Structures are given as C-alpha cells and as structure tokens.
Amino acid sequence: MAATGTAAAAATGKLLVLLLLGLTAPAAALAGYIEALAANAGTGFAVAEPQIAMFCGKLNMHVNIQTGKWEPDPTGTKSCLGTKEEVLQYCQEIYPELQITNVMEANQPVNIDSWCRRDKRQCKSHIVIPFKCLVGEFVSDVLLVPDNCQFFHQERMEVCEKHQRWHTLVKEACLTEGLTLYSYGMLLPCGVDQFHGTEYVCCPQTKTVDSDSTMSKEEEEEEEDEEDEEEDYDLDKSEFPTEADLEDFTEAAADEEEEDEEEGEEVVEDRDYYYDPFKGDDYNEENPTEPSSEGTISDKEIVHDVKVPPTPLPTNDVDVYFETSADDNEHARFQKAKEQLEIRHRNRMDRVKKEWEEAELQAKNLPKTERQTLIQHFQAMVKALEKEAASEKQQLVETHLARVEAMLNDRRRIALENYLAALQSDPPRPHRILQALRRYVRAENKDRLHTIRHYQHVLAVDPEKAAQMKSQVMTHLHVIEERRNQSLSLLYKVPYVAQEIQEEIDELLQEQRADMDQFTSSISENPVDVRVSSEESEEIPPFHPLHPFPSLSENEDTQPELYHPMKKGSGMAEQDGGLIGAEEKVINSKNKMDENMVIDETLDVKEMIFNAERVGGLEEEPESVGPLREDFSLSSNALIGLLVIAVAIATVIVISLVMLRKRQYGTISHGIVEVDPMLTPEERHLNKMQNHGYENPTYKYLEQMQI
C-alpha cells in the first residue's frame, strides 16, 4: 500500500510539473525574446518588441522598446513607404542598436493615439496594421490551443508566399473543416515578409462570438469622428499600407452640431462609407490587410455534360443580396453572401473528392482504360465546379463594385448640390459654405481613393494589366482633380466669403495634395505610351494656395457690391471655366473648350469635367495652343489624302464605264445582212466577223499609209 501511494504521489508530481511547464511556456518564450532584445540593444531591459506603423499623410510611428509607447519619426520627415524592402531599411534606421533581419506584418490591428500630420498640430487616433521588426534569428510565435480547438501546420519548401497569402490559405483550410481561424503564425522565412509555411489554430464558430460582441461594444463607445475612422478602416486592408487620410476636421464637426437646427436637412449627412472591392474581396475581421487571393480560373476546355452536384447549403444570403438594392449595410450583406458562396463551394468540392475516392476504391479491378475514363470524368467535374465558383464570385464582386460606385456617385452629387445651394443662399454664410465644401471634397476624395486602391491592387496582382489601365486611372484622377478645382472656382462669385475662409481652403487642399503626390510618385516609375502620357509625365503640379480673389480695401464696403446671387441652373456665362456635361474621355481636349460654359445641376457629377488651368488664378499657358495646331495639321493632311484617293477612284470608275459602253456599241449588229448561199464557210465566217466590227489589220494599215 505504501508503495502504491508513493507511486501515485510521484505521478501526481510529474503531472503538476508538466502542467506548470505548459502554462509557462508561452510566457517564457515571450520573456526570452524580450531579454534577447535587451541584450541586443544594450540599453536596458526591453518591455516591447520593435514595431513601426504608417499612415499616408502623417509621420511614421515606432514603438519605444523601453517604454512600450508609440513615438513619431525622429527626423520629422518620413511618411508611408512604398515596398517591404523600404520598411526593412526603415526598421534598421529606427532601431540601429538592434540587429533587424526581417519584417513581418502583424496579425491584428492596433489603435495609435495622438498621431499628427507633418508640420501640423492636429492629432487624432488611427487604427492600422503595424509591421514587426524581427531581431536576429527568426522565432515563430507560440500559439495557444483552447478547448475544442485544433492545431495545424503547413510547410512547403518549394513555395515562398507572403504573409497575407498564408493567412488566406489557413482561413480557407479552417472553413474546409467547418471551423474558423483563431490564431496563426509564420514558419521558415524565405524573404522580406515571405515564408515557407505557417501554423494555425482552428476553433468552432461559437468561440468567436464573445470577441465579436466585445469589439461591437467598443465601437459603439467611440465618438462620431472615430466612427468615421472605423468605417474607413475597411479600406485599410491593402497588401501594403496605402491608407489615405479621410479624417474630418474636429472644428467643423463641432460647428455642425451647433448649426444643425438652423440648417435642417439641406446638407445631407455624409456618412464616411467606403468599401474597396478590390482589396476587400477576401477581407474578414481577423486580418483587415488580406488581399484578393483568387483570380479568374483559366480553363481552356470544360466538359459540358458533367453534372455538378446540388448545393448542400441554402443560398438565402446570396439570393437576398442580389434581390435587394444597396443600402448602408451593403458591405455586411456582401461579406455574408461571399462567405456563403465559399462555404457552398467547399462543400461541393468535399463531396466530389469523397465520391472520387470511393470510385477509385471500387475501380481497382477495372481495366486501365475505364479507370482513365473515370479519372477524366472527375477531373472535368472539379474544373466545372471551380469555373462555376469563379463565375459566381466574379458576379458577386462586380455587383458589389457597381453598387459601391453608385453610392459614391450619389453622395458626391448630393454634396455638390448642397455646396451650390450654400453658394446661392441669400445672404451666403461663410461657415456653411466651408462646411458644404469640406463634405464635397471629402466625397471626391472617396472616389479618388477608390481608384487608387483599385490600381494598387491590380499592380500587385497583375502588373501587365496595371500598365494597360494606368492611362485610364490617371485620366480619372485628373478628372476628379479638375472637377474639385472647378467647384472651388465657384467661390469667385462671392469673393469676400472666399477671403474669409481662405486659410481653411488652403489647408484642405494641401492635405489632399499630400496624399495625391504620394500616389503619383509611387507609379511614376512605370510610364505608359498612350495619348495622355504627356499629361501623366507632368503629373500634378506643385501645390499653390488658391488665391483667385483680388485684395480688398478695408475702407470699402465690399459685401453689397461684390455679392451677386447665383441663379440656380444658370450660372457662369461671364465666368471663365464652368461645369459642362461630357464624358471623362474628352479630358485630353480640355484646353480646347469654350470659355463660356453653363452650370447644370441636373448633370451627373461623374460626367462633369472642368478647366483647372484658371482655377488657381494662374494665367493660361501659351503651350496649350500647341496641341490644337498639331491636331489641325494632322486633320488637314488626312483630308488631303482622302481627297486624292477619292479622285483616283472616280477616275478609274469613269474609265471603266467608258470602256464598257464602247464595247457594248461595238457588238451591235445593224440591220439584216443577206448571206450568199454560194459562199464558203470561211467567207461566211469572215462576213460575220466584219458585221460585228472586225477589220483586217493589213487593210487598215494600208489605208493609214495612203492617208
């Protein structure tokens, strides 16, 4: 009995030791990494791992490993970077005392407070995905496996994929098992933010309910401005940080609350909604930076008589999405429909694979030709399923894209109408005009950001296609730029109001210009030989504050004299430049337009183009005449060539008609010719030939000689 008790006590002690080791393993690993950081730095005990964060238009942030707090760029100049290699170099510059060997995108976003713009005092908090600066030899993350969860890992030495790609694969792997992704980590680095494998934990879907409810409660507690940031957070999921600054001004927000009762509903509330369908195709709450990982499946031949197994799950979410129109819940309904399609496709594939395995087991004793036919049948079935899934997903994404573009256009149109209404009010109120202008510029920026994100996604996935669409992207960006500048030029109708809000306008334009310069500089390395390449090479001119208004004397009573209410729908026949209805493709002929133009508020905002050369008070450049002369010269040369060709064709036709008519007259036989029955057949034939116009060339020659 004593021996038995001793053995039981020993077993219990071993179990407790193993339990303690299991509980302390993650903490020990993290502590070891922190101690390694401190030893590497030589500056004291580190409390945080080195990380950097970027937000375009604002200074880069990095973690102070001694304090654990986020600090701005020490040089005060560095903003968002362009490549992962630049991120690695920046990590090495920020942490020179550490041996930074690689970078890796973090799995979860962070909220950084007091994030300021360059040379600005305005600071706000933003939610971004930071980059981890990896020190020394790579150490994989320690993953916890909760109850009822499963641990998996994948290693492919022949594959070197990015962080986002591995995340997509593990998420799909969990969905295949009927689970959801709980956590994951990278294995075996093979490049900058590239790895040979990953390890991950999948849990039942009920495990994520608590975390989702916690996140929703936290979002409800945010202020109005922060809610705008959260909604724009759906945008911050590009393959590389290209977040544009969509923050609203805090002063304007406060003023809006003060004047809500006066303005009523004339200025429509501009909810900061935006969804990027090109980056958000594979987006989920676990990793907002996940890119689209599924392209169009290229199958040359599909067997059409293959019967696709029926859908095991209902398609209510998909049907509801297509049957209902767009609303404020567009993004949520799109996500639900997309997830439903993925689950349905996975179940179909699992069913086909299971049937394939069963058929192979039963076909072991069959001849080789029959087994080959069976294999081809299932291969065709798999291809048909993949093609159908790709088609359904493409239809879903295209529908969502069209709805998002329509929503952006509607909000931009409403913002422009409110801005025009504010200008036409009697008397005009400067603050209300500024507020409406900010909303309009914000709506234009949504469209610009939508276009930029689309191009950046295509550039990362298909550079060849990006090169083909670059001219279209730049044209659309120029259209947005000119449309916005022309709207600003409408302030010329009320110069005293424009002078009062001049500083706010300059600041607003400079903020938008900073983001635009960042994008144009990133794509200027890949020129495209198209018609608009001359405009693209110039890109966007450096920022000049908008001062189209003459200085006014303080002694003059300018308000009654300078104020001329704009008649709604008529507008600016005397004003240089105006709003006209046109397609965006005529942007290349913008310098040839008439100066007397009319505002028509019924026009779709997307179809308006403007003459931006006179918006900033700049004189029209004489070089603008050059393209007109060149086009005229080319048109004249083409016209002359067409005339020459037409004359030649007409000459050939006339000659042909004359020859044909001459031949017809030559074959006419005049009257009845009596034939001598005594003539020989040769003589009869000669007479017949002479009757039809035949002349003996010898006789004809002799006659000509006598003449």
Swiss-Prot record:
Residues that bear Phosphoserine: 216, 534
Organism: Mus musculus
Protein name, UniProt field: Amyloid beta precursor like protein 2
Cited function: May play a role in the regulation of hemostasis. The soluble form may have inhibitory properties towards coagulation factors. May interact with cellular G-protein signaling pathways. May bind to the DNA 5'-GTCACATG-3'(CDEI box). Inhibits trypsin, chymotrypsin, plasmin, factor XIA and plasma and glandular kallikrein. Modulates the Cu/Zn nitric oxide-catalyzed autodegradation of GPC1 heparan sulfate side chains in fibroblasts.
CDD domains recorded: JMTM_APLP2
GO biological process: cholesterol metabolic process; extracellular matrix organization; forebrain development; intracellular copper ion homeostasis; locomotory behavior; mating behavior; midbrain development; neuromuscular process controlling balance
Residues engaged in binding Cu cation: 163, 167, 184
Membrane topology (UniProt): Single-pass type I membrane protein
Region annotation GFLD subdomain: where it falls in the sequence: 46-139
Subunit (UniProt): Interacts with CPEB1. Interacts (via NPXY motif) with DAB2 (via PID domain); the interaction is impaired by tyrosine phosphorylation of the NPXY motif. Interacts (via cytoplasmic domain) with APBB2/FE65L. Interacts (via intracellular domain) with APBB3/FE65L2.
Biased composition (Acidic residues): 218-234, 242-269
Matches recorded under InterPro entries: Amyloid_Cu-bd_sf, Amyloid_glyco, Amyloid_glyco_Cu-bd, Amyloid_glyco_E2_domain, Amyloid_glyco_extra, Amyloid_glyco_heparin-bd, Amyloid_glyco_heparin-bd_sf, Amyloid_glyco_intracell_CS
Stated family: Belongs to the APP family.
UniProt cross-references to SUPFAM superfamilies, sorted A to Z: A heparin-binding domain, Amyloid beta a4 protein copper binding domain (domain 2), CAPPD, an extracellular domain of amyloid beta A4 protein
Gene: Aplp2
Taxonomic path: Eukaryota, Metazoa, Chordata, Craniata, Vertebrata
